[in-house]
């Protein structure tokens, strides 16, 4: 059975503030095969790496709760989460270079085009995915050579159809809704299954036994140790 990729969920978020440069650097140190991150588009078009639509830890009360798309890159760089600034996608790409794969989740409206512009020249070291399958379809049109994936937190009757609809490669499946039939169905169309977010030894062993292609986890060291890597 092939060894699954170990993908650091928002970086090594079990040890460092999520989606921070420190978390991504730590993921490299721990031997992750890839990092997963989230992007939103700032008001000036910059892609900011952050999970929620509106960042917390604002330096000024007037900025608290303001959505990323209403703030400039300069304003967003004044935010701190446990001492860590919000990085741009370019910051992360500069940090990791091509040492591992960058899996970019398209979160906010208008993120597909700028993400594709930054990632299209590194198809072996980057991919995009989203819960909004329309954005994945847009990425297919803009950067057909860039690997694509769809996120699912349910179990459709034909789980592989959403992947086929965007000519995608990776099905990001919430691990609680993952079984052998789903893995086999995706593999039958030459797709890949990435299980998320898998954080306990028993769950890591279970999804690995199903033959998943990637395990997205907050705990890279735990996953590697559990699998004997």
Residue map of PLM features:
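Phosphate-group recognition and catalysis centered on beta-loop-alpha active-site segments
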Residues: 1-229
């Amino acid at each position: 059975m092939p060894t699954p990729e170990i993908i650091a969920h928002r970086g090594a978020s079990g040890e460092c503030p999520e989606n921070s440069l420190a978390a991504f650097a730590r993921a490299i140190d721990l031997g992750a095969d890839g990092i997963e991150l989230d992007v939103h588009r700032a008001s000036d078009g910059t892609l900011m790496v952050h999970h929620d639509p509106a960042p917390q830890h604002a330096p000024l009360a007037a900025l608290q709760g303001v959505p990323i798309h209403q703030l400039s890159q300069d304003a967003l760089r004044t935010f701190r989460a446990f001492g860590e600034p919000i990085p741009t996608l370019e910051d992360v790409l500069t940090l990791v270079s091509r040492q591992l794969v960058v899996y970019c989740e398209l979160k906010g409206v208008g993120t597909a085009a700028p993400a594709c512009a930054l990632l299209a020249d590194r198809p072996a070291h980057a991919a995009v995915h989203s819960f909004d399958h329309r954005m994945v379809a847009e990425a297919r049109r803009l950067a057909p050579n860039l690997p694509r994936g769809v996120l699912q937190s349910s179990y459709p009757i034909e789980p592989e159809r959403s992947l086929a609809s965007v000519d995608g490669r990776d099905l990001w499946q919430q691990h609680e809704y993952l079984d052998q039939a789903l893995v086999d169905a995706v593999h039958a169309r030459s797709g890949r299954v990435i299980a998320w977010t898998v954080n306990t030894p028993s769950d890591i062993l279970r999804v690995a036994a199903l033959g998943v292609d990637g395990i997205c986890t907050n705990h890279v060291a735990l996953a590697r140790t559990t699998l004997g890597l």
